[in-house]
């Protein structure tokens, strides 16, 4: 039994609340247990300079944590004058994951900017951000269709992400902070609804892991992502 009472193959309580903000074209509050992330999707009628005149659009992301999202206050990165390496890595991952399932040609020469702001962190903020940002992105696309700006949703398939790890010799799904801090191995999987991988991140903190252990983690991640996508679909149909 895990610290929060789950079995090894259980996700935390997952909740995705759509239309959380008034002004954004797409917005959700995504909750993975005690991890809470506000994801917004904003439409801009322009593209980066390297895409001008090419007929395609762009999807990009920014990620940040509120100063008191964690146990002790962390200074705002804006106050430091630069983004940290972890922030750069995570926001690039979110952007890549969403572009992997978007037909940028159908979007036309416009951009969707995703903002993922961590309100409360208890492990898995990047996986929660990707899972929630997908729903916010679809809502922004649906808004564009409703305005007659684009003819069809430029979404090829769904995308979601989850963490897995080895803690005390046991493979666990969707690690919380306590589990993540004790993990011998920590992995993040980003997958599409067709069962393809967008990204796999894995690190051995102590003992290196075997192919068999990696297969076990992959299998558990695939089960978790299938459940997450069912939740995404259910929420989008409401």
From Swiss-Prot:
EC number: 2.7.7.56
Stretches assigned to coiled coil: none
GO molecular function: 3'-5'-RNA exonuclease activity; RNA binding; tRNA binding; tRNA nucleotidyltransferase activity
Catalytic activity, reaction form: tRNA(n+1) + phosphate = tRNA(n) + a ribonucleoside 5'-diphosphate
Enzyme class: transferase
Superkingdom field: Bacteria
Pfam families reported for this sequence: RNase_PH, RNase_PH_C
InterPro entries: ExoRNase_PH_dom1, ExoRNase_PH_dom2, ExoRNase_PH_dom2_sf, PNPase/RNase_PH_dom_sf, Ribosomal_Su5_D2-typ_SF, RNase_PH, RNase_PH_bac-type, RNase_PH_CS
A single BP term in Gene Ontology: tRNA processing
CDD domains, A to Z: RNase_PH_bact
Gene3D superfamilies noted in UniProt: GHMP Kinase, N-terminal domain
Keywords from the UniProt entry: Nucleotidyltransferase, RNA-binding, rRNA processing, Transferase, tRNA processing, tRNA-binding
SUPFAM superfamilies registered for this protein in UniProt: Ribonuclease PH domain 2-like (SSF55666), Ribosomal protein S5 domain 2-like (SSF54211)
Residues the entry annotates as binding phosphate: 86, 124-126
Family affiliation: Belongs to the RNase PH family.
Quaternary structure and interacting proteins, as annotated: Homohexameric ring arranged as a trimer of dimers.
Function: Phosphorolytic 3'-5' exoribonuclease that plays an important role in tRNA 3'-end maturation. Removes nucleotide residues following the 3'-CCA terminus of tRNAs; can also add nucleotides to the ends of RNA molecules by using nucleoside diphosphates as substrates, but this may not be physiologically important. Probably plays a role in initiation of 16S rRNA degradation (leading to ribosome degradation) during starvation.
Alphabetized HAMAP family for the sequence: RNase_PH (MF_00564)
Protein name stated in the entry: Ribonuclease PH
Species lineage: Bacteria, Pseudomonadati, Thermodesulfobacteriota, Desulfuromonadia, Geobacterales
